[in-house]
């Protein structure tokens, strides 16, 4: 398994949810809304309605997936329903 931890914000609008995609399919939704005062300060977040709860975390059980190379990406959905895809990269799952 592996953990995904991060943060996301959208000034004036706010983030509604963050989903994890593998090969462009939603596999899970993260636990969004964890306190991240450091992000508010470092990124000068002023008007996101979720301040200071901009953090997220998720534990992914890799045994649910075949050993392979996957396209990983986050799908951010703001409170207006606008979708932003972020962080696309290739990840290798290799369960021993």
Placement of each model-derived feature along the sequence:
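Basic, ligand-binding patches in group-transfer machinery
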Residues: 1-96
């Amino acid at each position: 398994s592996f953990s995904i931890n991060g943060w996301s914000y959208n000034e004036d609008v706010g983030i509604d949810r963050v989903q994890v995609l593998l090969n462009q399919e939603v596999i899970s939704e993260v636990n969004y809304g964890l306190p991240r005062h450091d992000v508010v300060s470092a990124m000068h977040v002023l008007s996101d309605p979720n301040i200071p709860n901009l953090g997220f975390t998720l534990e992914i059980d890799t045994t649910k997936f075949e050993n392979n190379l996957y396209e990983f990406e986050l799908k951010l959905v703001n409170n207006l329903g606008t979708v932003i895809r972020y962080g696309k990269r290739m990840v290798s799952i290799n369960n021993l």
